[in-house]
Amino acid sequence: MEYQILKMSSCLFILLFLTPGILCICPLQCTCTERHRHVDCSGRNLTTLPPGLQENIIHLNLSYNHFTDLHNQLTPYTNLRTLDISNNRLESLPAQLPRSLWNMSAANNNIKLLDKSDTAYQWNLKYLDVSKNMLEKVVLIKNTLRSLEVLNLSSNKLWTVPTNMPSKLHIVDLSNNSLTQILPGTLINLTNLTHLYLHNNKFTFIPEQSFDQLLQLQEITLHNNRWSCDHKQNITYLLKWVMETKAHVIGTPCSKQVSSLKEQSMYPTPPGFTSSLFTMSEMQTVDTINSLSMVTQPKVTKTPKQYRGKETTFGVTLSKDTTFSSTDRAVVAYPEDTPTEMTNSHEAAAATLTIHLQDGMSSNASLTSATKSPPSPVTLSIARGMPNNFSEMPRQSTTLNLRREETTANGNTRPPSAASAWKVNASLLLMLNAVVMLAG
């Protein structure tokens, strides 16, 4: 009896001693840590899963092997958090992956298509690396990959940026592809994106509003693309966005055009004007008059008992220094009160002149004939100094020559009365006013 009890006790002891080893067995081709829940089977030339893997493993590294197909082979590992199947010969992502995955790397395989079924139930996945494959198409569905924060699709054969990318993405790497376009609305939901890598592609331009919602962006790479710097209509949006964004831009496209836009934003110029300035001195009669001088030089020729004629010269000199902005039109300085319809013609500008006359004839009243003969004919001539070339003739002058012809009196000569002198002065002023109005 005692012998049987002792025999049973030894068996129980051996069973209790071996039980932990049975529960925590590690495959011979792998190394295990963290209580055999982290399993590393990389670089063992495996083509199938090694036997003896525990179903409660949380980390599995199968990289650098010769796997070509892992469909439905990883489904039992419902606690799996990290899966590395990079550097194998897989042509597609394994079907029926456990939904517990957080991180998955499938880089450097032969995957040509990332189909919607490959990621349909990966609600917990945060990191997905499918770089260095042969991807030509990526199909994503809305409301899948809800937790995805990092998506690496670099070094593939993509020609358009994938649509329906998850809104929680922080990092998207699309570098080293053959990307040529971004479809409208592709990036509109990526409001949490902080890093976007687009270098080494074939972009020529970025469509309007493509980057407008990337408000959290911290870094973007744009170098080594085929930007159409000479097509301003297409490239203007990207250049303005580069100037205004707070993100760090690596590889600024069309640097010369960006510098030009920065200068224009710092020194804005009204439409139709250029930024150059030049000075024009005393070139135009139509301006505010700084100095107005009038010179009266009476010249009287007498014959016995008659007045043959009288000649009076009025000289008007205008001067003005003005600075103008260069435009595409001819340079003409117009006063503030010049009518709008006159500002488009050199002739209108030259004809507009205002002369203020003083009473210079009152002292010559004694020269007026007192005869009852008809009013003397008056001849007025105006010589305008409008230059044909402003740069060659900067000073402008206007000369008014007034000549009055009087008939010969046969009667006795006597000093003219004051009434006759006033009549002559009034007629002269009226005629002068009429001439100035006609000239204007």
Curated annotation (Swiss-Prot):
Residues 1-24 form the signal peptide. Residues 25-55 form the LRRNT domain. Gene3D superfamilies: Ribonuclease Inhibitor. Oligodendrocytes and myelin of the central nervous system. Residues 418-440 form a propeptide. Ser/Thr-rich repeats lie at residues 229-270, 271-292, 293-335, 336-377, 378-416. LRR repeats lie at residues 56-78, 79-100, 101-121, 124-145, 147-168, 169-189, 192-213, 216-239. Keywords: Cell adhesion, Cell membrane, Glycoprotein, GPI-anchor, Leucine-rich repeat, Lipoprotein, Membrane, Repeat, Signal. Its main location: membrane. O-glycosylated in its Ser/Thr-rich repeat domain. GO terms for molecular function: identical protein binding; protein homodimerization activity. The keyword Signal applies. InterPro entries: Leu-rich_rpt (IPR001611), Leu-rich_rpt_typical-subtyp (IPR003591), LRR-bact_E3_ubiq_ligases (IPR051071), LRR_dom_sf (IPR032675), LRRNT (IPR000372). A lipid is attached at S417 (GPI-anchor amidated serine). It is found in: Cell membrane. One of its GO terms (cellular component) is plasma membrane. Glycans are attached at N45, N61, N103, N152, N176, N189, N192, N234, N364, N389, N425. It comes from the Eukaryota. The keyword Cytoplasm does not apply. It holds the Pfam family LRR_8. It is a lipid-anchor; GPI-anchor. GO terms for biological process: cell adhesion; central nervous system myelination; neuron projection regeneration; regulation of collateral sprouting of intact axon in response to injury. PROSITE patterns: LRR. Cell adhesion molecule contributing to the interactive process required for myelination in the central nervous system. This is Oligodendrocyte-myelin glycoprotein. It comes from Mus musculus. The lineage of its organism: Eukaryota, Metazoa, Chordata, Craniata, Vertebrata.
